[in-house]
Amino acid sequence: MKILAWLLFATSTHAADLVSHASAHPDGRAVFSFDASAWQSTDETRRMPVGVFDSGIGGLTVLESLLTLDAFHNDTLQPGADGTPDFAQERFIYFGDQANMPYGNYPAVNRTDYLRELIVKDAIFLLGRRFWSAEGKEPQFTKPPVKAIVIACNTATAYGLEDIRKAVAAWKIPVIVVGVVEAGARGVLESQAEGGIGVLATSGTCASGVYPRTITQTLGLAGKSVPAIAQQGSPTLAGAIEGDSAFPESVSAYALKEARALAEAYRGTKAAAPLQTIVLGCTHYPLAKNEIDAAFDELRKDAALRDLIAEKRVFVNPAEATARELFRELAKAKLRLKADEHCSIEQHQFYFSVPRVDETGVQLSADGSLDKDYKYSRAPGHLDFEDTKNVPLTPDLIPANSAKLVRERLPAVWKSLNR
């Protein structure tokens, strides 16, 4: 297995080591492992929930789309709404890696290998049964495994989608893996907007170049001309939306700063058409769409920027396209629940990561989160050490301003969280 893993992960030996580590502990009791015997039959697999993960609460925007999508007929599987949510019978397990967010900042400090390891660890958590209670001293093993993994994080998709797909292939398990970036590019194509394209994302996502590359490929394959594309990577906006104390200004203030930077980046393309399509290239950003849109309106009051920005912008949120892709993939693999079947869990489940405050060597900031210098100086390869633990997420654990955004803008998620 180790030789196979190294061949699959030629660019990341640490990802290969993690795949080998999980394979070496097939009972799923060890740290970063899962029960490899869980997927014994298609019938058993079909009754499993779907896993969704992000680096924090931003992926809840994707979960909202999954809970509310009505784009297919549930009986015929053909396109078209039928009045019933397309995933009404399915159940979801959501994981937000809150303790290690934002993922977009790791590449900027040369911690890409550690980021890739984190992303594969997220997948392993969803595949496994292992979790911690909020006050527990020992892990528990009653979380169900999943039949599909939705990477509801643009940075994680950019840096980890292929790693997870290769890992699933190496482990020989029938688990579907879907990411958000390709969906975002399809959203640009379907918008049919004529102006320029701006990508607002994290620093890490922008550094990867994945959106300009994927948008160009998608438009090109469809026989469409490719307009000017500019991008702006923010190290602050996702954290501000999360309510992280390290980012004390308002979400509106950070949104204005990033919108201005994107407009200036678009000016640099020297395109004749104004900036019209805004790709919300971080799953946190739909939670602040109103603030971002207002920021562009504010910028248009500046005569030097007015002609650079379209009066009416088109916002592309990759979440709905991701939900459509998951529906198609589950149907193709015959893993959608049948009309007379039920998932192995009755309700959706939510988890997030917190620092292990009792673990030797873990460094914390004054508010109890991981110390910033400690967080971004960690190295991969320590597969017997957990400085964070994954615990059930309840509404009271979400920062107040983030909870307000979820309650007001993601009603289906909020209802599920409060059951």
Model-assigned labels for residue ranges:
Residues 16-419:
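Non-catalytic structural scaffold of enzyme domains
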Residues 10-12:
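N-terminal signal peptide c-region/cleavage motif recognized by signal peptidases
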Residues 1-6:
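Sec-dependent signal peptide recognition
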